[in-house]
Amino acid sequence: MNPPIAFAHRGARAHAPENTLPAFSLALRLGATGLESDVWMTADGVAVLDHDGVVRTGLRKKPMSEIMAKTLPQHIPTFDEFISSLDKTAHVSLDIKDLQAFEPVCRSAGDAGFPLDHLWLCHPDWQELANRRALEPDVRLVDSTRLAKISEGAERRAASLREAGIDCLNMHHSDWSGGLTTLVHRFDRLAFGWDMQFDQVLDNGFRMGLDGVYSDHVDRMMDSFVREIEPFSERF
């Protein structure tokens, strides 16, 4: 992608409480072009954004699937609240923690007028995503994994993703190299890298051709973007 997407991991979590509407808003003000979060379903079928998917009730912790949406702590946003607050130019990357969320998320985004080709749905089982490709042909699907888990090899995986209509391979930044991004691009798939927290890591990621990077530190990420991408980007 030109330019690559700069995803704020759980919003501007290095600067504000993670996965909250203020954190997401701050990330965009700091220049992030994408937002990342995790989506779960409540007991009454509401898609909500939270990392762990558990809620403390008294001395106990309950999974999100056992909690009614109206009883959630106020800081946990629903996906509807989140998506309706966004500028339509932003990108959104969601880790699908409950596969039941796939259709409601796509439907809510469409109802809000959010461009579905800016919605990136990530899951560690690419075949589960492939099974859902026909449900929503416009949404972006992302295979989130580690290189060590790709037993068939990166080239075979990239070919499988192309055949299945999965748009992107997302791995830890340490799994990527310039040669591997080139291989993935040869199959017309995109390459995303996560856990990119430091200047050198971000700079190297942009230089090797990653199409999307994820960082907690939006200020560092955007400084790196200015150094490595902005002078060559079609957007500027």
Q: Which residue ranges define each predicted feature?
A:
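Long, acidic (Asp/Glu-rich), low-complexity accessory segments flanking structured domains
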Residues: 1-14
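An active-site metal/cofactor-coordinating segment within enzyme catalytic domains
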Residues: 3-6, 33, 39-91, 97, ...
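Short, cationic motifs built from Arg/Lys/His that form the positively charged side of catalytic pockets
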Residues: 9-10, 36, 133
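Histidine-centered active-site/metal-ligand motif
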Residues: 9-10, 51-52, 185
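Active-site beta->alpha N-cap acidic-glycine motif
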Residues: 19
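Short amphipathic alpha-helix
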Residues: 22-23
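Catalytic domains of carbohydrate-active enzymes, especially glycoside hydrolases
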Residues: 26-41, 161-169
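Short loop-to-alpha-helix "cap/lid" segments that border enzyme active sites
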Residues: 71, 80-92, 96-236
